[in-house]
Amino acid sequence: MVSFKQLAVVAFASTAASKSVRRTTPPVASVTCNGQAYTYDGLAGFGSVKSDARDQYGDTISIGSSMAIKDWKKAGKGYKATMYGLPDRGWNTNGTQNTTPRVHIFEITFTPAPDATVAKPAGPNLEFNYKRTILLSGPDGKPMTGLDPDFTGGLGYPGFPTMPAATYPGDGFGGPGTGDKRICLDAEGLVVDDDGSFWISDEYGPFLYRFDKNGKLSTAVQPPDALLPVRGGKVR
């Protein structure tokens, strides 16, 4: 997976901190969405995941595409929450590789630093405690891949539209193996449901995919026909 020297520098809208700290300066921005008011007072916290941190499968950790926060609650002088982190499709500066798409789960702890100033800035006050990783698979349980889709045609399953796929030789990393054909995923956006399942937006399709809490694909929402890439009468 892609590794960053400084990863997951996070700016929190300070709605949580504002409940306990009175602000004397006007907010940077305010917006109302669906009847709920949100106020952004400035950078409230920052932290990082070590560049050499690895997940339970031995791959370096990235959460660069999207993040979702669940179970935000007060804890002492700070706050705790569960964070779902979505990596991109894997290292790809010289072409894509057969990286299995995944979602990382962290417990995060945020401790406000209301007295910090430009002259006396606070240190890192957002901690990431890695918990586990969910690998993403197709409806048949076969792992998905970060490889670019090819022109051999997509993969179809009962109740699903044809989805972009890649056929690769060997192990998909340039090494020996039996080869395979798998659904491709270039993960970009993430929304987590209350039951632990989650939606991911895919740039390859583009599709919207829903996965169960174990990472198995359960729903695929295909874009309108006018947006589908068609060549020779087939979706590519």
What are the roles of these predicted feature ranges?
Residues M1-S20:
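Fungal secretory targeting signals
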